[in-house]
Amino acid sequence: MRGRPWLLCLLILAGCGQQSPPPDTLVVAQVAEPRSLDPQVTTALNDFRILVNVYEGLVRYRPGTLEPAPGLATSWTVSEDGLSYTFQLKPGVRFHDGSPFDAEAVRFNFERMLYPDHPYHGTGPFPLAFFFEQIAAVEVLDPLRIRFVLSEPFAPFLSNLAYPTGLLVSPTAVRRWGQGYGRHPSGTGPFRFVDWRADERVQLGRFDGYHGEPARIDRLIFRPVTDPMTRVAELMAGGVDLALELSPDNVAAFRDRDGFQVLERTGPHLWFLILNCREGPFADPRVRRAASLAIDRDALLHSVLRDTAVAAAGPIPRAFAWAADPGLAPDPHDPERARSLLAEAGIGDDTELRLLVPRGGSGMLAPLAMATAIQADLASVGLHARIESFEWNSYLAQVNDGLAGRADLAAMAWMTNDPDTLPYLALRCAASPEQGGFNSGYYCNPAVDTLIEEARQATDRAIRAQHYRSLARLVEADAPWIVIGSWRQNLVARARVAGLRLEPSFFLYLDGATKQR
């Protein structure tokens, strides 16, 4: 075990006097203050971890998988042409404010999200429209049956319903609070909203009127603790019961420390470098491949990330086992081959690059440490990258506007709910920043576009899988990204906390959590 992180923690702890939470309360150290508790507004995993304890959707992910399973809908049928989905709703369900959950409430939610003329529309940004843009109509058949009519077959529809964007809010509460609803949420989940003290906490309480198995603990408190070392100190001092997204060094140290438990699980996450395919050295695919061969992925995963991530290849995370190509492997570390390709492309050993990297951010692992290691690997073959780092929101503004005229490569991470999401948003020719997409490197291969569209519309999973594997092989051959790995999400808790589980969705369900007295 390395001592340095613990020395820092002990120095911090010398000034800590946090009172331990009571036995009926679970305190979670989050990475940031939530933006909103309205599922039609927020897009951050940090906020999702709170939302999934307050709300439910028609569909949820089956525990331990990314497979759609019944939620507030007990069953559903799909028309033969894939254009109509009819859901049977669970009877007797009420929102936390006492209003009934029924088909009219479902229609209100989706019309609020999709229709610009809805009186409570305009609550949030992309990706809300993307997830459900194929909905042409929402029809109430009776109080417990609702039908969605789509404009075209859309295979990810059920998976998107299970995502937090599909969580259902109380129409009564929305009408009462209007644009302020995000700070006064009301769902149907096992916990109800109690209060939100800015920069201090969000508090939830067990909902005694819950329609399912009641939560096993009385209260949840989510505290924003932005500094990871402070999260460690709070955990050590007993001020919090569990902490999320600790540094690789601290996770490694906690694995062997008595009195604590470490939960880790790989999910649908990718960390990669976006390459500027429009201009500069990386417009040549040989240079892109050379850069990939220059990077020592094993050293990044084991030495820098301390095994908090696993190797990945291609644009489809391996968490989607049915869609990912098991034969696709990362490039080996081969500096000699990299130098040969660079010479073939006429690239000298004094080539300068601009590498953009955030100082932090959801799913970004250890971006500065990774960038420094990558910088050294690239320099070993004559590619000299100048690192420029930014605060997360400033970084997104830079990268999402496109790399042309700004940089040669940039670090990025995505967590997705379906194999469709990342290719559609970030690899299509029509997904350039100028067109509202996230293809910041301007990669374009019409054959990939065709496969993305065919996969979206194929309702037969085996056919979808064939399309995803074909497009993954094309993308890997073109090398518009250098894919490094998939994050093993981590949670460190005190040993007295039981009933915790990590899901491949990265969501944190706490209704089964308990604390030993």
Task: Identify the function of each model-found stretch.
Residues 17, 380-397, 424-494, 517:
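Extracytoplasmic/peripheral linker and loop segments enriched in polar/acidic and small residues
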Residues 19, 88, 107, 125-172:
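Surface-exposed binding/hinge segments that line
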Residues 30-80, 111, 118, 184-188:
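N-terminal lobe/hinge region of extracytoplasmic solute-binding protein
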Residues 62-63, 154-215, 219, 229, ...:
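Gly/Pro-rich hinge or "lid" segments in bacterial periplasmic/extracellular proteins
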Residues 74-120, 147, 234, 281-283:
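Aromatic- and charge-enriched surface segment that lines or borders ligand/interaction sites
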Residues 182, 208-253, 384:
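Ligand-site clamp/hinge motif
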Residues 311-345, 361-369:
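Structural transition elements
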Residues 491-517:
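Long beta-strand-rich cores associated with HINT superfamily self-processing modules
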